[in-house]
């Protein structure tokens, strides 16, 4: 299943006037107000990061996210398209969130608003109101990793079935850039900067290029992506799923949690 949609494909959905289409602008409201896709509602997803993956933390995450998804009008019948300026981390976070809640009818706009605007497709400036719903999506624990799960996996040094993938910059991975109490990376993690997923024009690279980028990662393994706040890692999550990786989790707490927990191990 592919979790991206092209500008031409989305344009066709608009022309069909489908009432099951929900388009969500994941950029800051200041950007949305200057121009956005037709009928799009705005939710600044960067405001909803989560760095507590304790049992209680995940319980609260589930409750809060279901409220948000209900407020913006997600129902089981909706095909939900997220976009930001490019094929970025915020729209990817939205897609991951819906997949986590067992809603597979979702995609992110490849190339984002910038590509849509460059192609001179329809844009509007009026703010669109949410149509509230009651979202009933069921969390899928196989799509999310918490710190306890990762800790249990790296403790078993003989466990070769799991690969931890760090989507941050090389400097964050190596520890020369410090954004938490501790610097470095989760032990045994390999690093592929999420920005390598995207062309200079802001759209995703072709699958042939992405296959080459991730050729060192076996598809039969369980992959756990992480970054600092669970956004860049969401972009990598979407890429891997598009490439046919079936067993992919995202560590939603990421380094913002791991790097600030004194009892968790790190490597530099």
Regions found by a protein language model. Name each.
Residues 1-268:
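Cytosolic catalytic domains that perform sulfur/thiol-centered chemistry
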């Amino acid at each position: 299943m592919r979790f991206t949609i092209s500008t031409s494909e989305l344009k066709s959905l608009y022309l069909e006037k489908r009432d099951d289409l929900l388009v969500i602008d994941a950029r800051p409201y200041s950007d949305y107000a200057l121009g956005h896709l037709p009928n799009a509602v705005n939710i600044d997803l960067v405001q909803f990061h989560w760095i507590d993956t304790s049992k209680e933390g995940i319980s609260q995450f589930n409750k809060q996210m279901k409220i948000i998804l209900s407020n913006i009008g997600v129902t089981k019948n909706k095909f939900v398209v997220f976009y930001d300026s490019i094929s970025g981390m915020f729209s990817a976070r939205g897609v991951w969130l819906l997949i986590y809640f067992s809603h597979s009818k979702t995609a992110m706009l490849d190339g984002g608003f910038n590509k849509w605007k460059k192609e001179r497709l329809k844009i509007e400036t009026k703010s669109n109101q949410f149509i509230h719903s009651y979202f009933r999506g069921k969390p899928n624990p196989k799509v999310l990793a918490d710190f306890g799960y990762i800790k249990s996996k790296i403790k078993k040094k003989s466990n070769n079935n799991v690969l931890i993938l760090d989507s941050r910059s090389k400097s964050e991975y190596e520890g020369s850039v410090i954004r938490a109490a501790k610097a470095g990376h989760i032990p045994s993690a390999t690093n592929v900067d999420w920005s390598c997923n995207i062309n200079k024009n802001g759209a995703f690279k072709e699958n042939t290029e992405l296959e080459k980028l991730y050729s060192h990662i076996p598809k039969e393994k369980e992959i756990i992506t992480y970054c600092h706040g669970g956004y860049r890692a969401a972009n990598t999550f979407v890429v891997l799923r598009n490439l046919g990786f079936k067993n992919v989790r995202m560590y939603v707490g990421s380094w913002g949690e791991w790097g600030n927990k004194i009892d968790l191990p790190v490597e530099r």
